[in-house]
Amino acid sequence: MTTLSDSALDQLFLSARTHNAWQDKPVDDALLHRLIDLTKFGPTSANASPARFVFVKSPEAKARLKPALSEGNLAKTMAAPVTVIVGMDMAFHEHLPRLFPHADARSWFAGNDALIETTAFRNSSLQGAYLILAARALGLDAGPMSGFDGAKVDAAFFAGTAIRSNFLVNLGYGDPAGLFPRSPRFDFDDIARIE
């Protein structure tokens, strides 16, 4: 495997920002399909792939999402071309015979609600992070958020299923005029050590 170019690293990490304001420019559905085609290849435990994604685009879908949003996230989410609900399928293990066929991985989870919860949350969070990086790689900007009422989102979008919401990500083409100055980040010695 080779190292990415400095310009690619810059696009994915160094110059990429969390956007709160959006250009009035639509995101094509074909690009969202491509986004999932990249995201799905990020690693998860036993290839469990518990994340489920709802791309909220239409005015009707936005209206269903709106009552679940915290006040601070309302305007920017309504203005975003797309809001992704990153959900987690609490019955993900039912798909393991297909996704992880070389072991009886379903039996590791069946009846173990605590392990299901931990695995679904951890791995759907990973998949949401892959989605953010894939979006940046495809020229989109992202604004992840956790300020929302999960029960309301679940009732509006996942009723009658085993899927629960994890977090939200606004997607589109960011308006740089809406950016705050970049906040500080930790240095290596503040957060890491080598043993």
UniProtKB/Swiss-Prot annotation:
Keywords, sorted A to Z: Flavoprotein, FMN, NAD, NADP, Oxidoreductase
Organism superkingdom: Bacteria
Required co-factors: FMN
GO molecular function per UniProt: oxidoreductase activity
Pfam family, one: Nitroreductase
InterPro entries: Nitroreductase, Nitroreductase-like, Nitroreductase_HadB/RutE, RutE-like
EC class (word): oxidoreductase
Signal peptide: none
EC code(s) of this entry: 1.-.-.-
Similarity comment text for this entry: Belongs to the nitroreductase family. HadB/RutE subfamily.
NCBIfam families assigned: PRK05365.1
PANTHER family documented for this protein: MALONIC SEMIALDEHYDE REDUCTASE RUTE-RELATED
Protein's name in the database: Putative NADH dehydrogenase/NAD(P)H nitroreductase Bcep18194_B1060
Lineage start: Bacteria, Pseudomonadati, Pseudomonadota, Betaproteobacteria, Burkholderiales
